[in-house]
Amino acid sequence: MSYYDVDSILTDSQKLPCTFELEVPGLGILEGNPGEDIKAGTRIDLPLWLGVMLSIGARLGTSRLVTLDLPSALSDRVVNALKADPRTVDLRSLAPHFYSLSERVLDLFEEEEMVDVLINTFKKRAAEIADHAHNPKGALGEGADFLRGLDETERQLFRVAHDSARETRIWAGEAKKR
């Protein structure tokens, strides 16, 4: 993604739980207390980009300012639900850019099992998305709830699959151009 990519900017603005390891003078504005200090052990949800920047000290060999935690969208409860049946999980309510957020977070954490769960989730949901996209009546009825729960990556996939199915029907002479 590029610097000016809106989806990338929105992904980086998603909140990530961070725990301060050191006392930081004058940074209380992050808690809504301007002019106050942030005490060591304070847990605050920060935008992903800021949390990553504040955690960089550990990589440079200095004391870590903050420790990053997994966001609620990737909690054990969500991962277990994805293992059970990924098609029933409303990813959009967890994070509008769920897969982009997952990719960014998994760059920071070593969670091999979660990678496998997310790959399996995408495969199963992509098959369901393709089914709804190729079946014009599939977006109605029981499929409407599923389609409302798609994250942005899945919505783009649905649009491309739907448009290509429509173009194929037009090419085959089964449908008219609008």
UniProtKB/Swiss-Prot annotation:
InterPro entries: GINS_A, GINS_bundle-like_dom_sf, GINS_Psf3, GINS_Psf3_sf, PSF3_N. Keywords: DNA replication, Nucleus. The keyword Nucleus applies. It comes from the Eukaryota. GO terms for cellular component: chromatin; CMG complex; GINS complex; nuclear replication fork. CDD domains: GINS_A_psf3 (cd11713), GINS_B_Psf3 (cd21693). The keyword Zinc-finger does not apply. Its main location: nucleus. One of its GO terms (biological process) is double-strand break repair via break-induced replication. It is found in: Nucleus. It holds the Pfam family Sld5. Coiled coil: none annotated. The GINS complex plays an essential role in the initiation of DNA replication. Component of the GINS complex which is a heterotetramer of sld5, psf1, psf2 and psf3. Belongs to the GINS3/PSF3 family. This is DNA replication complex GINS protein psf3. It comes from Aspergillus fumigatus (strain ATCC MYA-4609 / CBS 101355 / FGSC A1100 / Af293). The gene is psf3.
